[in-house]
């Protein structure tokens, strides 16, 4: 299935967090916090203004990002894989 985000939305694949502590202890899934880093899979065309123009998107496909994993972030399963749908405003940084 192909998915195309609208407006200023992004499709992101969450990066997994390592399940070992710094001391080498294997952590249970309950004690491992979900990562707020991911890889951008798809990007919308940008937010549309009332005059019909669109804001240019700063985030591009393939970017590694740090995002705010808050209320506006939606989780969807697509072809058995889990993806996040979020707004560009939820992106805190691009990792270079």
Curated annotation (Swiss-Prot):
<dbReference type="Pfam" id="PF00166">
    <property type="entry name" value="Cpn10"/>
</dbReference>
<dbReference type="GO" id="GO:0005737">
    <property type="term" value="C:cytoplasm"/>
</dbReference>
<dbReference type="InterPro" id="IPR018369">
    <property type="entry name" value="Chaprnonin_Cpn10_CS"/>
</dbReference>
<dbReference type="GO" id="GO:0005524">
    <property type="term" value="F:ATP binding"/>
</dbReference>
<protein>
    <recommendedName>
        <fullName>Co-chaperonin GroES 2</fullName>
    </recommendedName>
</protein>
<keyword id="KW-0963">Cytoplasm</keyword>
<comment type="subunit">
    <text>Heptamer of 7 subunits arranged in a ring. Interacts with the chaperonin GroEL.</text>
</comment>
<comment type="similarity">
    <text>Belongs to the GroES chaperonin family.</text>
</comment>
<dbReference type="InterPro" id="IPR037124">
    <property type="entry name" value="Chaperonin_GroES_sf"/>
</dbReference>
<dbReference type="InterPro" id="IPR011032">
    <property type="entry name" value="GroES-like_sf"/>
</dbReference>
<dbReference type="GO" id="GO:0051087">
    <property type="term" value="F:protein-folding chaperone binding"/>
</dbReference>
<dbReference type="GO" id="GO:0044183">
    <property type="term" value="F:protein folding chaperone"/>
</dbReference>
<dbReference type="InterPro" id="IPR020818">
    <property type="entry name" value="Chaperonin_GroES"/>
</dbReference>
<comment type="function">
    <text>Together with the chaperonin GroEL, plays an essential role in assisting protein folding. The GroEL-GroES system forms a nano-cage that allows encapsulation of the non-native substrate proteins and provides a physical environment optimized to promote and accelerate protein folding. GroES binds to the apical surface of the GroEL ring, thereby capping the opening of the GroEL channel.</text>
</comment>
<dbReference type="GO" id="GO:0051085">
    <property type="term" value="P:chaperone cofactor-dependent protein refolding"/>
</dbReference>
<keyword id="KW-0143">Chaperone</keyword>
<dbReference type="GO" id="GO:0051082">
    <property type="term" value="F:unfolded protein binding"/>
</dbReference>
<dbReference type="GO" id="GO:0046872">
    <property type="term" value="F:metal ion binding"/>
</dbReference>
